[in-house]
Amino acid sequence: MGKTTGFMDYTRKTSTDVPPLERMENFDEFHIWLSREEQQTQAARCMDCGVPFCQAGMMIGGMASGCPLNNLIPEWNDLVYHGKWELALHRLLATNRFPEFTSRVCPALCEAACTCGDVTGSSVTVRENEHAIIETGYAKGWLHAAPPPARTGKSVAVVGSGPSGLSVAEYLNKRGHAVTVFERADRVGGLLMYGIPNMKLDKSVIERRIKLMQAEGVEFRTNMDVGGILAAEELLSSYDAVVLCCGAKQARDLNVPGRDANGVHFAVDYLTSVTRSLLDSKFADGRAINAAGRNVLVIGGGDTGNDCQGTALRQGCTDLVALEMMPQPPKERAASNPWPEWPRVLKVDYGQTECLAKFNKDPRIYQTTVKEFLKDDAGNLTGAVISYLKPERDPETGRTRMVPTGEEFTYDCQLAFIAAGFTGCESYVADAFGVDRTPRGNVADQNFKTNVDKVFVCGDMRRGQSVVVWGLREGRDCAAAVDRYLMGYTNL
């Protein structure tokens, strides 16, 4: 595939970024993408390896290795190298209906499993090749509405319009079923719209795709709180199948003194308020939680915590500290973490890069957690007592846990964002439909079907907190299960 000697002839080259201090002046996407000619050269580095782990999507050590969508990566790399962009688009869309999302926000599991990366030390630029393919497709007019040629007469209600909801709706509509998507928020997109900041995924990209889906026959109904203002019974009586795609939105809280202080927020609530205010009024309405002129504490070191860092910096925070409970990862792979496993190494994301540029420091403090939030007489947050932690083996379970060392310090802050992950789906939708739950708080299923007749579940609501690409895979697989239920067979 590609040029036989490409991985030896060419070095890896990726997009550049707008300088940190400059890009923090706005909420725009900041990648400066390669030209199509440069991207063709990068595609030539795909090395015709015997076993393309990049597309395997295997679980190794509890983590994914390679693309969960099983994208045909060597195929479309070869087509890009030869300048056959439209054919590359068709091969990409064969497995991934939303590459404009994954090429922006996916952690690139494919690149971590790239054989070229293992052999040469620098993987093929798979994610950026994917971005070039889909954006070339839009620019050339190759993506246009293609409604199904015939309808099956079956109807499906999809509850939730995040990655899995959009994915299951896309595939079921293409199959010919009448699909209606119900979204609780005022805009379609779920996690994509409000859980990911605009500079990471411009909302016009989502809206462009939604318009295409609408033109193909998918109906979207916003401000529809299923299980709240809209009874579950109404959907069950009106549709041939119902798919629950409500995510894992039950945020993990901190049960510490002072948690009720004004200024302590869940991270997703913060990010949602900022994006909504940006879209509604370009911040003129003053409804966004605002970090301007304030010291900010972020609790949690994942993608959401990083997004909080980047958002607070753009708003003009005066200082920033991010707490991470676990020890700092190594800079290089440990012997116990061999390729093609996902590399458990130190990552520097855009939020940390921007903090370094503005405050000359990495905001992260490892092996720490909040012991207590401090507040004044009016109940406003004034600071937090931070405890240092150390790993300790639990004698009963044998697992390692983090316990306080006894060493503490106080950080003066006026805002704190809890980005400690999620514990499962919100209970009221599951309760409204009467579906069973697992001990981990997810909806229980057998091949995406719940214990309730004609009710299915997919995405984070089924598998727990995950990433966008897994939501898309869940939606694709669930659509096949729903189609089989409705038709007695499936060709999805």
State what each model feature region is.
Residues 8-32, 41-44, 70-80, 91-92, ...:
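Beta1-alpha1 glycine-rich phosphate/pyrophosphate-binding loop at the start
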Residues 13, 18-37, 42-45, 366, ...:
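C-terminal catalytic lobe of FAD-dependent flavoproteins
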Residues 305-310, 461-489:
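A conserved FAD-binding loop/helix module that cradles the flavin
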Residues 152-155, 223, 292-295, 367, ...:
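Phosphate-coordination loops involved in phosphoryl transfer and adenosine-cofactor binding
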Residues 151-164, 291-302:
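Beta1/beta-strand and adjacent pyrophosphate-binding region of the FAD-binding site
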Residues 40, 44, 48-56, 62-149, ...:
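Glycine/serine-rich phosphate-binding loop and adjoining beta1-alpha1 elements at the start
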Residues 150, 155-159, 207-256, 371-385, ...:
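Feature captures the FAD/FMN-dependent oxidoreductase FAD-binding
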Residues 260-293, 392-465:
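FAD-site-proximal beta/loop scaffold in flavoenzymes
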